[in-house]
Amino acid sequence: MDVRPLHHPSLEDITVEGILHALSDPVRVAIYADIVAQECSHNCSMFLNISDKAIPKSTLSQHFRALREAGLIRGERRGVEMYNTSRCAEIERRFPGLLRAIVNAHAIQSKDEAQARKLAGKRSSRRSVKNN
């Protein structure tokens, strides 16, 4: 079986622009925030449902590739499975505070969005009660 090696940029080749581009996608930032929070390697299939949305495996693979090529994660093949870990500690040395700020901002935004969905659900249930 011919398996191509995964590309992991050296720390010196990681750029702020590359990081910001990789994390500009809501699915990728959610994946990355989860990997950082768990501090252990994750099998790609753990992310088939992000933010209550089903994601096809092929799309998920592309998201992981973007994160890996930006230098945010390190991928490791174990048999047929791929496990990913954060390179947060390495990047922190190069760009102190950058990833922490992004992950914290994502957490605030996610909390606000969850509250808005909850509030919208209450409003719609009140409307259906009024209509009955």
Predicted regions and their residues:
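A generic structural-conservation signal
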Residues: 76-77, 101
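Short amphipathic alpha-helical segments, especially helix-boundary/capping motifs
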Residues: 4-9, 20-23, 38-40, 64-66
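Conserved acidic functional residues
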Residues: 25, 63, 96
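Generic signal for short, ordered secondary-structure residues
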Residues: 2, 10, 14, 26-27, ...
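Canonical helix-turn-helix DNA-binding module
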Residues: 47-75
